[in-house]
């Protein structure tokens, strides 16, 4: 398995 660095979470879109 290749090393995968931590991925930042996707941007959260606020729902109104």
Swiss-Prot record:
Q: Which residues form a coiled coil?
A: none
Domain of life where this protein originates: Eukaryota
Q: What keyword terms does UniProt attach to this protein? A: Cell wall, Hydroxylation, Secreted
Cellular component terms, GO, for this chain's entry? extracellular region
Enumerate the subcellular locations listed in this protein's record, separating them with semicolons.
Answer: Secreted, Cell wall
Task: Provide the positions where the record notes the PTM 4-hydroxyproline.
Answer: 6, 8-11
What is the protein's given name?
230 kDa cell wall protein
Species name for this entry?
A: Phaseolus vulgaris (Kidney bean)
